[in-house]
Structures are given as structure tokens and as C-alpha cells.
Swiss-Prot record:
It is an enzyme of class 2 (transferase). Pyridoxal 5'-phosphate binds at residues 80-81, 160, 188, 208-210, 248. One of its GO terms (biological process) is [2Fe-2S] cluster assembly. The modification N6-(pyridoxal phosphate)lysine is found at residue 211. Its EC number is 2.8.1.7. This is Cysteine desulfurase IscS. It catalyses: (sulfur carrier)-H + L-cysteine = (sulfur carrier)-SH + L-alanine. Its cofactor is pyridoxal 5'-phosphate. The active site is at residue 334. Belongs to the class-V pyridoxal-phosphate-dependent aminotransferase family. NifS/IscS subfamily. Homodimer. Forms a heterotetramer with IscU, interacts with other sulfur acceptors. It is found in: Cytoplasm. The keyword Metal-binding applies. It comes from Rickettsia conorii (strain ATCC VR-613 / Malish 7).
Length: 410
């Protein structure tokens, strides 16, 4: 049983970029499709199949509506990792006899970078664009990187580690003018910030269910129909999902994703106000009480559900142990098992000391003001204690530049 403190249940969940709790309304919508409405949506000869198919198509239209897409442009997958792989490898395989170059960004999610590395082994040329110290790409650098051999540009909308929002509209405009396909991993922005695939000229977009209060194991790939985008499937079989993704569709999970998208569509404004208020409260109160705390990533051009903070003079891992009543992360959930400093922070030019002290705090739909205040009090008291014990902090206070120290190796 979790301990309770003045109606506050501990530990407090603050890792909304890793996953989100399922919204009770989503759970309620899914349950009948686990029990009485169990039909296969591909069974065309009886009412069990028709009922499941109707539910799938209704969910498909809800997902499409949230990004201004046509219902037929939504392909269901197992999640954003599969969607990213299908988009990048699928385009590369289909168009490789005409073009052989893809552009992405050094700070993309691991699955995008690894899909690109896989293609490099197959002879595709990949350009990894750098990011500025605020985490945003430079549009001129992108323009200059595009050649007549470029088939695809892949840039995520909201970074999973630092929360910065890339200028998708401008990127889409450049890609359309140059005749290059534009893919975006929108998993962290879908349902949280306004995204319009037509206004942004996006050709492919990857979506995840469990980042928007839906179930795990379900996602989608938006694939533009006009002008038509072709991808070679990764999974072959019964030819479901316009031949791009074979396999029996998991009706309950799809219904959950659809319901999560519907709620996000109607409550985005409310959620945004709530998250922005808590972000400002959290950051302002931390800054009032402790010095040398740095927000990683652009303060304004970001999704404010993400606070990635570096605490000078404190080791990130010891900080996480000290604040064990807060469920937080020291990088993306996929790579936080490694003690290497975050590759995203390093690519922003952040030094090893501050990169090692970075912690990502996530705020979401169910975070309360009371939880934020508890978190701030806990963080400030623990930082003070850890800094008292830290020889590095003492040296910094004496004006010693830690970068210039030659550490002896024993």
C-alpha cells in the first residue's frame, strides 16, 4: 500500500514523458471489447465482426480528427517505435532505387536514430543535423543539407527529454518546396499541442497511445494520401491497414486510443492551462529557494509538461535516490538504465557536470498543485543537504572551474 500524507499518495508520479496513467474514461470505453464485444474486426460474415469493425473505424476517425487528417490516412501499429521504423525504413525501401539520402536530428528518439543507423549499413546516406544550445534546429542548416538525393526529413515535434517544440510548420514548408517527404515523430505532442498535418505539410507522423492517457501496445502512423506517400511494409500477412501493416487489429486497444484522442481533442485547452500553471509554479518556487538550477531547452518554445532541470553540484543519480518519493527520470525511460550523460543534453553543448545532474520532471492531466508543492519542498531540502556534502559544490563556491581540474586516475 502506498503511504498517504494529508491525502497525498506517495510516491508522486512525475514521469509523464515515459508513460501516462490510463484515463478512467478510456478504460471504461475499452472494457466491453475485452468481454462481450470480442469479435474480429476483419470478420465480414456476422454481427460480432461488424460491431468490432465499426468500433475500429470510429476510433480511426477520432485519431485522424486530432491532427486534421483523413480517416483513411491512419494506419494502426503497436506503438510509436513501430510507426517510426515503418515510416523511415518503409520510405527508404520503396524509394531507394531513385534516392539514397535521409536527414534527421541528433536529438531524435533512440528508435529514429537506430532505424537510421540500420539503413546506413544498407548504404543509405544519413545526415544528423545539430541542434542549437536551446535544443532547436537551425532552418538554414536544414535547407543546406537537402540535396537532389534526399528522400526524407525526419524531425520530432516535442522532444521526449527536454520538451522543446521544433518549428514543424517551417520545416514542412521547406520540405514541400524541395520535393522531399517530411516525417515527424509526434508521440510527445499528439493531443497536447495543436498539430495539423496539412498546415504543417507533414507526410508521415508517428503516434503512441500510452503517451496520451491511453493503453500501451497501440499506436498509429499517419500516411498522406494526396500527394500519395508509398511505404514498403515491415510486416507481411493478411494485407490489413491498406497493405502497410498486416495482423489482426486489437480492437480494445484501438478503442482506447480513439477515446484518448477524443478526450484530448475536447480538453486540450483545459489540459494546457493546467499544465502551464503547474510548470510556472514549480519552476518559480524552485528558483526562489535554490540557486544554480538550470532549465534545459528553450523556456518558451516547449511543451510545459516537461521540466528538465540541472542542479549544479549534485550528482543526478544520488538526487533521484534522495527524492525517491517522486517518480522521475534522469533521461528518457528507454536509455535511463545507462549511466552515460544524456546524448540530447550533450548535443546541446551542455557540459558533462550539468548533463550528469539533469532530472526530467513530467507534469500531466492528473498532477495536482499539492503534488507540485510537495515536490518543490522535497527537492529544495534534499538539494541543500546534498550540496552540503558535495566537495564539488564547495569548490564551485570558491570559484574553482571544475572543467580545468586534472583528476588523478587511481
Amino acid at each position: 500500500m502506498n503511504p498517504q500524507l494529508n491525502n497525498l499518495t506517495l510516491p508522486i508520479y512525475m514521469d509523464y514523458q515515459a508513460t501516462t496513467p490510463i484515463d478512467p474514461r478510456v478504460m471504461e470505453a475499452m472494457l466491453p471489447y475485452f468481454t462481450t464485444k470480442f469479435g474480429n474486426p476483419h470478420s465480414r460474415s456476422h454481427s460480432f465482426g461488424w460491431e468490432a469493425e465499426n468500433a475500429v473505424e470510429e476510433a480511426r476517425s477520432m485519431v485522424a480528427k486530432l491532427i486534421g487528417a483523413d480517416t483513411k490516412e491512419i494506419i494502426f501499429t503497436s506503438g510509436a517505435t513501430e510507426s517510426n521504423n515503418l515510416a523511415i525504413k518503409g520510405i527508404a525501401k520503396f524509394y531507394s532505387n531513385k534516392k539514397n539520402h535521409i536527414i534527421t536530428v541528433v536529438s531524435e528518439h533512440k528508435c529514429v536514430l537506430d532505424a537510421c543507423r540500420h539503413l546506413e549499413q544498407e548504404g543509405i546516406k544519413i545526415t544528423y543535423l545539430p541542434i542549437k544550445p536551446n535544443g532547436i534546429i537551425d532552418l538554414e542548416t536544414l535547407k543546406n543539407a537537402i540535396t537532389d538525393q534526399t528522400m526524407l526529413v525526419s524531425v520530432m515535434v516535442v522532444n521526449n527529454e527536454i520538451g522543446v517544440v521544433q518549428p514543424l510548420k517551417e520545416i514542412g514548408k521547406i520540405c514541400r518546396e524541395k520535393g522531399v517527404f517530411f516525417h515527424s515523430d509526434i508521440a510527445q505532442g499528439f493531443g497536447k499541442i495543436p498539430i495539423d498535418v496539412n498546415a504543417f505539410n507533414i507526410d508521415l507522423a508517428s503516434i503512441s497511445g500510452h503517451k496520451i492517457y491511453g493503453p500501451k501496445g497501440i499506436g498509429a502512423l499517419y500516411v498522406r494520401k494526396k500527394p500519395r506517400v508509398r511505404v514498403t511494409p515491415l510486416i507481411n500477412g493478411g494485407g490489413q491497414e491498406r497493405g502497410m501493416r498486416s495482423g489482426t487489429l486489437p480492437t480494445p486497444l484501438i478503442v482506447g486510443l480513439g477515446m484518448a484522442a477524443e478526450i484530448a481533442y475536447s480538453e486540450m485547452e483545459k489540459d494546457t492551462k493546467h499544465v502551464n500553471y503547474l510548470f510556472d509554479r514549480f519552476l518559480n518556487n524552485i528558483h526562489k529557494r535554490i540557486s544554480e538550477v538550470y532549465l534545459n531547452g528553450d523556456k518558451n518554445q516547449r511543451y510545459k509538461g516537461n521540466l528538465n532541470l540541472s542542479f549544479a553540484g549534485v550528482e543526478g543519480e544520488s538526487m533521484i535516490l534522495a527524492i525517491k518519493d517522486l517518480a522521475v527520470s534522469s533521461g528518457s525511460a528507454c536509455t535511463s538504465a545507462s549511466l552515460e550523460p544524456s546524448y540530447v543534453l550533450r548535443s546541446m553543448g551542455i557540459g558533462e557536470e550539468l548533463a550528469h545532474t539533469a532530472i526530467r520532471f513530467g507534469i500531466g492531466r492528473f498532477t495536482t498543485e499539492q503534488e507540485v508543492d510537495y515536490a518543490v519542498n522535497l527537492i529544495c531540502s534534499k538539494i541543500d543537504k546534498l550540496r552540503e556534502l558535495s566537495p564539488l559544490w564547495e569548490m564551485m563556491q570558491e570559484g574553482i572551474d571544475l572543467k580545468k581540474i586534472k583528476w588523478a586516475v587511481h
